[in-house]
From Swiss-Prot:
This is UvrABC system protein C. It comes from Staphylococcus aureus (strain MRSA252). The keyword Transport does not apply. The gene is uvrC. It comes from the Bacteria. InterPro entries: GIY-YIG_endonuc, GIY-YIG_endonuc_sf, GIY-YIG_UvrC_Cho, RuvA_2-like, UVR_dom, UVR_dom_sf, UvrABC_protein_C, UvrC. Belongs to the UvrC family. The UvrABC repair system catalyzes the recognition and processing of DNA lesions. UvrC both incises the 5' and 3' sides of the lesion. The N-terminal half is responsible for the 3' incision and the C-terminal half is responsible for the 5' incision. Interacts with UvrB in an incision complex. The keyword Metal-binding does not apply. Keywords: Cytoplasm, DNA damage, DNA excision, DNA repair, Excision nuclease, SOS response. The lineage of its organism: Bacteria, Bacillati, Bacillota, Bacilli, Bacillales.
């Protein structure tokens, strides 16, 4: 047993059966996951025993040690978990990777405030209103307010009057001493409007329209009329879900097949203006998962706390209140409960859709390999291994192999090869070498053999591979070749002793699968070749610099990875990784010659 596994096993025996938080660390001592538990020992043992889903399996495979912190209660564990996630931002805590950022309208906290549309919420810098369903909706609302209120527009106060002053859309605080009470009144009216109180602004515009009409200024009266209609259109676009205009978020969730879907409805001005959907693989009870989610939703993501948060009645209200500093409502009946139920129903529908898509995807890939086997006259190729070479005029030649199982990439079984015995650009011999090395090892280690081998190339490549398999290794595995057209796209599948074209329709699932395989093996091979060339070029440059031996060369490669990064580095950067000052100066000079 490897040392780290022994250490983990021994440490598990001393973990207490108490509530607390735990931190999983990788080989670099980086925190990769933070979790909480009612009983730490049971939760931590569960990671290292039994079967897991793919995500948890990947996580466990990277764990080299763990730490834990005992707390006095489950509530304290939840609060500590949120703080630890904020501190370390572990990559396996998926909620931190929320890339959904919604637009808000912001009134800045300045002497003469401005109106902005932003996706970034920074507490203490102003008032935020939203979220809006999309940027267009937020921009249209801002444009409307810009036309009605002569609010400051410039980012920095200029030293002279700008265009907005001359067209009546700014009071010119950059030059004139604008009455702050007048500005405060505008801010109040804008705030009321953005909070859903449009009666005040409509009444004001109607009065201005009548005044303009009585003064025979019909052009100005028409402008006010258009603004009134625009406001009415803007506020009536969405179905009214409630006459109560309290700003609230409504949460509902559903659980199935080890997954949890949480739906959030953003209710603003009586309208549902946005919906947020999050899928989470269950790693604790559904209630615990929800408490973690809602705490992160408001503390770690770009979401403004509403006046009310509505949640299902089966949850612990006090637990939620400990991490969400606003009014928590658990409606028992009526329209508000209907909204929570609707959010839960939508979550269930989203989960069902997810599983249906997975099922369809599996059906398509199985159909593709069955069709491929039928057209080639072989058994269904459950396991396919494909090879491609990459080099430039025989320099740094490499090869790569990708594996597809049940029509899907099996990336843990991808392999890279540096060509060892072939001199110069000889694609056929390179392919023979790699196939020989691959399947010699497969036989020696008792690894699974593929049902089909695909090479990127034609008859010459196929014959070379078949010769190695049959005459050197005694294997009888079907070998096919994939050819590309003049646009470098997958064109034909070749198979058989005379490398005949297999009749596949270009719109068939089988052909689509072959296209994916060829693209993937080419991508994998060429990426490896670029990495190899980069390292070779880097080594050759470093070889000519005094004071840089093999150990320092390795250190530089690990620390910077490329010449470009080294050229961007300072003397201090080199010294910080352990390069002596005189060598660092020499290195810096040579790189900038």
């Amino acid at each position: 047993m490897e040392d780290y596994k022994k250490r983990i096993k021994n440490k598990l025996n001393v973990v207490p059966m108490e509530p607390g938080c735990y931190l999983m660390k990788d080989r670099n001592d980086q925190v990769i996951y933070v979790g909480k538990a009612k009983k730490l020992r049971n939760r931590l043992r569960s990671y290292f025993t039994g079967a897991h889903d793919a995500k948890t399996t990947r996580l466990v495979g990277e764990i080299r040690r763990f730490e834990f912190i005992v707390t006095s209660s489950e509530t304290e564990s939840l609060l500590l978990e949120l703080n630890l996630i904020k501190q370390y931002q572990p990559r396996y805590n998926i909620l931190l990777k929320d890339d959904k950022s919604y637009p808000f309208i912001k009134i800045t906290k300045e002497k003469y405030p401005r109106l902005l549309v932003t996706r970034t919420v920074k507490q203490g810098t102003g008032k935020y209103f939203g979220p809006y369903p999309n940027a267009y909706s937020a921009q249209e609302t801002k444009k409307l307010l810009d036309r009605i209120y002569p609010y400051r527009k410039c980012d920095k106060m200029p030293d002279k009057l700008c265009l907005y002053y001359h067209i009546g859309q700014c009071l010119g605080p950059c030059v004139y001493d604008v009455d702050l009470s007048k500005y405060a009144q505008m801010t109040k009216e804008i705030t009321d409007f953005l909070n859903g109180e449009d009666k005040t602004i409509l009444k004001s515009l109607e009065e201005r329209m009548l005044t303009a009409s009585e003064s025979l200024d019909f052009e100005r009266a028409k402008e006010y009329r258009d603004l009134i209609q625009h406001i009415q259109n803007l506020t009536n676009k969405q179905k009214i879900m409630s006459s109560d205009k309290t700003i609230r978020d409504v949460f509902g969730y559903s659980v199935d097949k080890g997954w949890m879907c949480i739906q959030v409805f953003f209710i603003r001005q009586g309208n549902m203006i946005k919906r947020d959907t999050t899928m989470i693989p269950l790693q604790q009870t559904e209630e615990e998962e929800f408490y973690t989610f809602i705490g992160q939703f408001y503390s770690l993501n770009q979401h403004i706390l509403p006046k009310e948060v509505h949640v299902p009645r089966n949850l612990d209200k006090e637990m939620i209140q400990s991490v969400v500093d606003t009014k928590i409502v658990q409606p028992a009946r009526g329209p508000k409960k209907d909204m929570v139920d609707l959010a839960a129903h939508n979550a269930k529908v989203s989960l069902n859709n997810k599983f249906e898509l997975i099922s369809r995807d599996e059906s398509r890939t199985i159909k593709a390999i069955e069709e491929l086997g039928t057209q080639m006259g072989i058994q269904t190729p459950i396991r396919i291994e494909a090879f491609d070479n990459s080099n430039i005029q025989g320099v740094d030649p490499v090869s790569a192999m990708v594996t597809f199982v049940d029509g899907k990439p099996d990336k843990k079984n991808y392999r890279k090869y540096k060509i060892k015995t072939v001199k110069g650009p000889d694609d056929y011999k390179s392919m023979r070498e790699v196939v020989r090395r691959r399947y010699s090892r497969v036989l020696n280690e008792g690894l699974p053999l593929p049902d089909l081998i695909i090479v990127d190339g034609g008859k010459g490549h196929m014959n070379g591979v078949i010769d190695v398999l049959q005459n050197e290794l005694g294997l009888d595995i079907p070998v096919a070749g994939l050819q590309k057209n003049d646009k470098h796209q997958t064109s034909e599948l070749l198979y058989g002793a005379s490398a005949e074209i297999v009749p596949l329709k270009k719109n068939s699932q089988a052909f689509y699968l072959l296209h994916r395989i060829q693209d993937e093996v080419h991508r994998f091979a060429i990426t490896f070749h670029r990495q190899t060339r980069q390292k070779t070029g880097l080594k050759s440059i470093l070889d000519d610099i005094d004071g840089i031996g093999s150990k320092r060369k390795t250190l530089l490669l690990r620390s910077f990875g490329s010449i470009k990064k080294m050229k961007e580095a300072t003397l201090e950067d080199f010294k910080n990784i352990g390069i002596p000052e005189n060598v660092a100066k020499n290195l810096h000079e040579q790189l900038h010659k």
